[in-house]
Structure formats: structure tokens, C-alpha cells
Amino acid sequence: METKKTGTTTVGIKAKDGIVLAADTQASLGHMVETLNIRKIIPITDRIAITTAGSVGDVQALARMLEAEARYYQFTWGKPMSTKAMANLLSNILNGNKWFPYLVQIILGGYVEEPTLANLDPLGGLIFDDYTATGSGSPFAIAVLEDGYKKDMSIEEAKELAVRAVRTAGKRDVYTGSRKIQIVAITKEGITEEFVEFND
């Protein structure tokens, strides 16, 4: 039985005043496009979100787990869990399941104490960075990010770069959509979401 290929492109950028996450909205299965309207960025709290690349069921299970842990932390300590703490928690969860791994690659971004961006692999490898990309189109997206990123970018500049990175990946990676892009910005005021659509 042939394994059906799936794919996506998600990117994260640390800006001067927050975090920008972006992803295509296409869900593919093999050579078929299942939908053009899936959300691949999931809010965990009002200041932290994750992007999804990999098994949808695994990502949804992890998101529910992180939401519960964040609520428990808030209830116990009377303050929100920091982005770094949540990234380390997720890293421990993934590493603890390395013999039966979650088939995911996740970007976690948030602004609790400061803008923080992390990339996690299926075995819990954790890297904090200024920009990152995941999914089948990530080799194309990361090239755009490396070329266009600069320290102290504004949120708007980071949004423009993120859209350009996902669009470029969508033009070269058959499993990444390029017609509609989900963008989430996380600042100290909270999370905002928007969609950018293209006709070509």
C-alpha cells in the first residue's frame, strides 16, 4: 500500500514588538487537494500559538494538552506560563514519546514576557531562533527568510516577509498552497488573525 504524501509550509518571525506566524491553508492528500481553507495556526493561550506541520491528529492532541497545562499553570500560580516554559514543556512531551513519536514539526511563538519563537522537531529537539520554517516547503521559505530578515523588524514588515516566504514555497512545492495564507500576529496586546488571498 502506497503512503499518501501530505505537506505544508509554516513560518515564524520574531519582530521588534511581537511574533508573526504564517501558513498556507491548503490540505493535500497524495495528489489531491482536500481543502483550501484549513487553519494551520492554533492559539494555545491569548499570548501563545503553534503552527502545524505533520499529522493533524497528533497536532490537535498536543494542542489540547498544552491548553490544559496552560490553564492549570495559570490556576496554580496565578500568572500565565511563559513562552519559553511552554516550549520546554512541549519539548519534554515530544522527547518522552520518542519511541512512539508524534509525527509533527511545530513552531511555537508567543509574547508573555518578551517575543519568543521556537522550533520543535518530532523527538523534542528545541531551537529558539529569530525566524524559522517547517513543512515540505520549508527549504524554499527559509531562503526567503534568510534573505529578507533583519533585526528589529516591525510587525507589518514581518507579515510582508512571512507572506512572501509562504508564497514562494507554494510556487515550488506542490503540497503547499499559494492562493490563501493565514497570518497570526502576537503582541503584548494579544493575538490577531488575518487571511491574505491571491488570484494567480
UniProtKB/Swiss-Prot annotation:
InterPro entries tied to this protein: Ntn_hydrolases_N (IPR029055), Pept_T1A_Psome_bsu_arc (IPR019983), Pept_T1A_subB (IPR000243), Proteasome_bsu_CS (IPR016050), Proteasome_sua/b (IPR001353), Proteasome_suB-type (IPR023333)
Residue numbers annotated as active site: 8
Pfam families registered for this protein in UniProt: Proteasome (PF00227)
Principal EC category: hydrolase
Subunit-level organization: The 20S proteasome core is composed of 14 alpha and 14 beta subunits that assemble into four stacked heptameric rings, resulting in a barrel-shaped structure. The two inner rings, each composed of seven catalytic beta subunits, are sandwiched by two outer rings, each composed of seven alpha subunits. The catalytic chamber with the active sites is on the inside of the barrel. Has a gated structure, the ends of the cylinder being occluded by the N-termini of the alpha-subunits. Is capped at one or both ends by the proteasome regulatory ATPase, PAN.
Family: Belongs to the peptidase T1B family.
Name used for this protein in its record: Proteasome subunit beta 2
Gene: psmB2
